[in-house]
A protein has these predicted regions:
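Generic alpha-helical structural element
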Residues: 39, 420, 433-436, 490, ...
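Outer-pore turret/helix-boundary of cation channels
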Residues: 493-530, 550
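Alpha-helical structural motif
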Residues: 94, 107, 469, 473, ...
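Pore domain of cation channels
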Residues: 517-579
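Transmembrane alpha-helical segments and their cytosolic interface motifs
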Residues: 465-508
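Hydrophobic, well-ordered secondary-structure elements that form the walls
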Residues: 444, 505, 573
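N-terminal leader/targeting and pre-domain segments
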Residues: 1-473
Length: 579
């Protein structure tokens, strides 16, 4: 007989209605997206019969049963116990059970005494689910494929004992989910393919033991996911392929042990991601192929001991990524082929104990501030000019910086910074010393020239630069002529142009007067070049001498330039030759 046409929603797409109900059976029709998927028959069991079995310490087997308004709080009143007294259940089984209540389905402050507790394939419909401070004993706990419906789910301060805990494919409905301060014991813990609803999910201050922790392919909803201050124990931790939804994700102050932490292929959605003060332990940390969305990302004061941290092929949105005072430990740091085309990333007060791979696919801005580098920082990009903005300040380099100055466009990136010329000069000086150590002498020369230019500009304001003649003398003699001693070819060309220029003045300016009486040279042009050359190179006239004051003073000027430029050329050439 059909008792009810009313349809009750379990989740967004799943609903049910009771077709038949009596003291023996309950027949329920399940629908998905308004299509009938199953009609299932349950055995009806009176709630007070369950209470009697618990009180008599009999086995409680609710498998394939319809259970209505079950509440251990009501049971305590029924037997006259205090509301905080622990309820002991000798043996318990609830496979494919249908729990329903208009208020709470209450298993709070219960202790299961057998070695295995099973709720597999059960449904908690309509009511809120409360396992607050439950103790699951020493055995395995199975909530595989459980559907928790629309209400909140509370496993706060639960003790799961020493066995394995499994919530694989569990659907936590649409309400708030709480596992805060839960103790998961030393077994493996699995939430693989679990689905959390729209509300807040809280694992704060929970404790995992020696086993592995699995959240692979789990899906979270629209609110904050809180793993703050969680102890993930000594095993491996897997969050691979998790979708964290739209809310913030908080792992702040959590601790990982000896195992690896795998966040590969995770989608962090639209919220902020917080790993501040996280201790990642001794294992590797994998963020390979992660999508971080548009929220800000914080790793401030995080700690890695021995493992590497890997962001290869990761994708970042319109966000800021902060690594402040991070202790990176002995492992490598990898960002190769990661996409930060709309993201800003900043490292400050960090020590790089091992290699760092900054070969981004693209990056909007990279800021390195107060960094100590002990090994290799790699900027040898596969793509041309992937960085749009770059700055490092107070970098202490004990290792090496692998970079191609031209290919990476670092020179232009530093020059266009909105910082002082002194800060720019310091950056070029670090690069100059680094290239010298690596034997990249062409890059060293280029960095040195930029260092001297920024150092020169730092001594003058924009206004005084234009008016100060000493500034322009330095620009012309040291920069334009020989690029601060890095280009002997330029100095040589300047020497030749100087000789020809003065020869032209001796030849064509009327006031110039030179005595060629003792010379056997008859060609006037050759005479002028000869006089200019010996004046420039030797300051000795021999058979030719100036005949008036203007010519004599011009010869003095050329002689001085000759001494200066020849010395400049010698120093520049020898510097190149010795290297």
């Amino acid at each position: 007989m059909e008792l009810s046409i009313e349809e009750y929603r379990l989740t967004k797409n799943l609903s049910y209605r009771i077709l038949e109900k009596n003291n023996e059976i309950v027949k329920i029709e399940f629908r998905k997206n308004s299509e009938v998927t199953e009609i299932k028959e349950y055995k009806y069991i009176n709630t007070y019969e369950i209470y009697r079995k618990i009180y008599s310490e009999e086995k409680v087997d609710l498998s394939n049963c319809y259970v209505e308004d079950f509440s251990l709080s009501k049971y305590r009143k029924y037997i006259g116990a205090d509301r905080v007294d622990e309820v002991y259940i000798k043996e318990f089984m609830a496979k494919e059970t249908f729990f329903v209540s208009d208020e709470y389905i209450d298993f709070s402050i219960v202790k299961f005494e057998q070695k295995r507790v099973v709720f597999r394939d059960s449904i908690f419909a309509k009511g809120k689910v409360n396992f607050d401070k439950a103790n699951f004993g020493e055995g395995n706990v199975c909530f595989n494929n459980v559907n928790f419906g629309k209400g909140s789910v509370d496993f706060k301060e639960v003790n799961f004992g020493e066995g394995n805990v499994c919530f694989d494919k569990a659907n936590f409905g649409e309400g708030q989910v709480r596992f805060d301060k839960a103790n998961f014991g030393d077994g493996n813990v699995s939430f693989r393919m679990a689905k959390f609803g729209k509300e807040y999910v809280d694992f704060m201050s929970s404790n995992f033991g020696k086993g592995n922790v699995y959240f692979g392919l789990a899906k979270f909803g629209e609110e904050t996911v809180n793993f703050r201050n969680v102890n993930f124990g000594e095993g491996n931790v897997y969050f691979d392929n998790v979708n964290f939804g739209k809310g913030n994700v908080d792992f702040c102050v959590s601790k990982f042990g000896k195992g690896d932490a795998d966040f590969s292929n995770v989608n962090f959605g639209e919220g902020n991601v917080d790993f501040k003060k996280v201790n990642f332990g001794e294992g590797n940390v994998n963020f390979n192929n992660v999508n971080f969305g548009d929220g800000n990302i914080y790793f401030n004061k995080a700690k890695l001991e021995k493992g590497e941290i890997d962001f290869q092929n990761a994708s970042f949105g319109k966000n800021n990524i902060f690594f402040h005072d991070v202790r990176f430990g002995e492992g490598n740091i990898r960002f190769n082929n990661s996409d930060l085309s709309t993201a800003n990333i900043e490292f400050s007060d960090c020590k790089f104990e091992n290699d760092v791979d900054f070969r981004f696919k693209s990056c909007k801005s990279l800021n390195l501030k107060d960094i100590t580098n002990k090994q290799t920082m790699n900027f040898r990009f596969e793509n041309n000019k992937p960085l749009k903005w770059f700055k490092f300040k107070n970098l202490i380099n004990y290792g090496r910086i692998e970079i191609d100055l031209k290919q990476s466009n670092f020179k232009n990136l530093i020059n266009k910074q909105n910082s002082t010329y002194k800060e720019k000069a310091d950056q070029f000086l670090i690069l100059k010393e680094n290239f010298n150590n690596l034997g990249q002498y062409d890059d060293e020369d280029e960095a040195y020239v930029e260092f001297k230019r920024c150092e020169r500009r730092s001594r003058y304001t924009t206004f005084t630069r234009k008016l100060n003649p000493l500034y322009w003398v330095e620009v012309m003699l040291f920069d334009w002529v020989g690029a601060y001693g890095t280009k002997p070819y330029n100095v040589l060309c300047t020497m030749l142009l100087t000789i020809i220029g003065f020869a032209t003045s001796y030849l064509y300016i009327p006031t110039m007067c030179i005595n060629f009486d003792n010379s056997k040279i008859t060609n006037e042009i050759v005479k002028a070049i000869y006089y200019s050359g010996i004046t420039f190179l030797t300051i000795g006239y021999g058979d030719i001498s100036p005949q008036n004051e203007i010519t004599a003073m011009t010869s003095v000027i050329e002689g001085f330039l000759g001494i200066f430029l020849m010395s400049y050329f010698t120093v520049s050439f020898v510097r190149k030759l010795l290297r």
